[in-house]
Amino acid sequence: MAVKSLVFRRKFPLLVTGSLLALQPVAALTVQAADQFDCKVSATGGWDCSPLQNANANLPPRPAHTATSVSTAAAGSSVSGSGGETVEAEPTQRLVTESGGRALKSRSADYSHLDWIPREKLTAAQLAEIGPYCGGSYIEPVRPGMDDGAPSDESPTYVSAKASRYEQEKQIATLAGDVVLRQGSMQVEGDEANLHQLENRGELVGNVKLRDKGMLVVGDHAQVQLDNGEAQVDNAEYVIHKAHARGSALYAKRSENAIIMLKDGTYTRCEPSSNAWTLKGNNVKLNPATGFGTATNATLRVKDFPVFYTPYIYFPIDDRRQSGFLPPSFSSTSDTGFTLVTPYYFNLAPNYDATLYPRYMAKRGMMLEGEFRYLTHSSEGIVNAAYLNDKDDHREGFPDYSKDRWLYGLKNTTGLDSRWLAEVDYTRISDPYYFQDLDTDLGVGSTTYVNQRGTLTYRGDTFTGRLNAQAYQLATTTDVTPYDRLPQITFDGFLPYNPGGMQFTYGTEFVRFDRDLDENIYFNDDGSIRGKRPDASLQGLARATGDRMHLEPGMSLPMTRSWGYVTPTLKYLYTKYDLDLDSQGKTDLNKRDESFDSNQDRSLPLVKVDSGLYFDRDTTFAGTPFRQTLEPRAMYLYVPYKDQDSLPVFDTSEPSFSYDSLWRENRFTGKDRIGDANQLSLGVTSRFIEENGFERASISAGQIYYFRDRRVQLPGLTEKDLKRLNLDPSGLDNDSWRSPYAFAGQYRFNRDWRINSDFNWNPNTSRTESGSAIFHYQPEVDPGKVVNVGYRYRADARRFDSSRGTFRYGNENDIIKQHDFSVIWPLVPQWSVLARWQYDYNKNRTLEAFGGFEYDSCCWKLRLINRYWLDVDDDAFLVQSEKADRGIFLQIVLKGLGGIVGNKTEMFLDKGIQGYRQREDQAM
């Protein structure tokens, strides 16, 4: 019968036995000092004690312990038998130091002594917390006091056992049978315990378990200091539940502040039955308060073989950040040679940190990159910088080149108050060849230019004002210098009153466009002169700079019902220019018999009527009930024609036609061209929605009907421009009475399979303008399976031709005909294949291909991938380098310690395989 838990205060925790004596008659205390008492629970819940003639008569049998277990008398190789004789102890328990870091099956064949629960017995919530290849998890059992946060010296001690006795002379109490001592969040269990009243010390033997918050230590013998919670467990195994970590030690010590010290300790994230990798150290320290551990004279062992030694290592035991070396990365390319990056992370404070990236490149020398991140109550940002004294002389003599290669940048967002927001995104590089020659770990978003922007925004109740200053620095010599916006001021909003349901809006913008043209020569990679930079090809108004002001007041009357809507809209579009043009530009215009007007304006009305209906019905397909919708839409748009050929193009382009193009107010982006329109757009969308809200399929189709030719075009695409360039203007598609048919749709076979497609067919030329189809497979219950098959075709591109300084229609060389196939597929449990193949049929070449395999277990992962790739600029349809790159990439991840090599592999896998990131996020 278990004793009801009693409460004892600090300084006198051992009254559990002293109080038993106090309950007896005074005469009973006259027995000999050697007399002992047998105490059991009475019917009332108190103690019922009586003296024993034989001290061992009614106690449960003493459990057998190994010679390494420390008895209540001394640590030795013999124990006293029931008759007082000396009996040699049988060594039945294996030492953890002999197990090579493996869990001891001698304690439990199923490792239940480590709170190990097999996968088939886990709940759905517990399965969601572990990886797909984990055979189970360490589950901490619910127990009293496990969430107690009180200090140990202020916590009472709770004791329970099946039976007890007390030696009055020695003031030692002996407990036997399912002994439990609990103080605060700490709990110690054992078969037997001796409680030394004078020393406030407890000694437990047999199946010892020490539990604390999220941690378990198992051993043969334990000593516990009952006044402060210090403890030592011999022949110990331990588990950190949340980290899915375990280990062993000759002995484990728990300090008063719950830090665990291990002698000859090990640490691993592998399952109890596995020893794939183990970290072993002479002295290992685990600090749950900080979430990190340390080890001295540490050896990393893989399958019992030592592969790495360090005199000191700092490693995580949970997800918290801490200063230390991050996993290194290795690579080798023709530009840099062998490259080694050894990042070091500085955890300076909870709200700011830094990372240093020393990068050794065999061909170029040592490069230092650094990044500082910060977060305050009103700001967040990143400061970064890099420097290299380049010892490679490949670009010696190139314009704008210096051996001192550098980069610095700042990204900051500051909320000044609830309405004011300040933003900075500024990066500067030493030369335009920086990203062509060097890799970076600083997260720069573009390798063709770097952004230099500062913005101040005010958000009112009915308006938003913004002051923006934005410049660009080219990181290539093959693009035209972009315009800077210095400054750009916008003010947009709506009126707070709505008479008769009317809505009044307004938009204003003032911007100064400026740039410094660079007409120097540039070189091929072999050092030969290629010619002048693209800025030299700019002619006429393409060389202009100046100010532009745009006003756009509007009014609309939304009329909405449950079955449809009609929204007429009226806008007034006014734009004014104050232009500058250099002498070269004026000369170009004079040669064409064209004049230059520095002050111009443009005013146009815009009338739009947008309408739609909504129908739905209940239907059934293949035995599944659906709600099918039918959503026809019609939009009439009228904008009169106005000649805009005398206006420069600062920020305007014409996007490719798609289903969304049917509903645009302007077929151009930007404000430099307002497309003339007298057209009616008709479209319809139908959706199939299941009863639970899951959209099984949707399809949209539509077309624009033109009542007038579209005469406003980009420079270089007008009939006049084509004739001037001796090009055939008959290819212009601005006089047809209808647009291409536009289709868009998606179909989900189930929640795992889907296909997305768009298609544009031109009835005027009887050809496909563009189209794509992408098939994606990734099961919700098993995201480790990924299949992507896609094809895209595009022949309607309008691009800026840097060799002519104007826009032009894409030619045969610009047509995109590409397939993209990628897959991640398990071959057998834990082994998967990863592959991608992207091929350009127009130029008959592979753009990227890689293939390899992955081994994934609960505690480590390995990837080996062979990759071939070209650097492609999708926007310009240009291959940056005709020279292909090749590489073999190795990635090894020891879960719980991080990646050992190959972290760069993550970058091209994430970019190249749709669904890869979701797979990784759900894996662990």
From Swiss-Prot:
A GO cellular component entry from the record: transporter complex
Coiled coil stretches, renumbered: none
Annotated stretches, region: Disordered: 58-101
Major location (coarse): membrane
Function: Together with LptE, is involved in the assembly of lipopolysaccharide (LPS) at the surface of the outer membrane.
Family: Belongs to the LptD family.
Quaternary data: Component of the lipopolysaccharide transport and assembly complex. Interacts with LptE and LptA.
Protein's name in the database: LPS-assembly protein LptD
Organism: Pseudomonas aeruginosa (strain ATCC 15692 / DSM 22644 / CIP 104116 / JCM 14847 / LMG 12228 / 1C / PRS 101 / PAO1)
Underlying gene: lptD
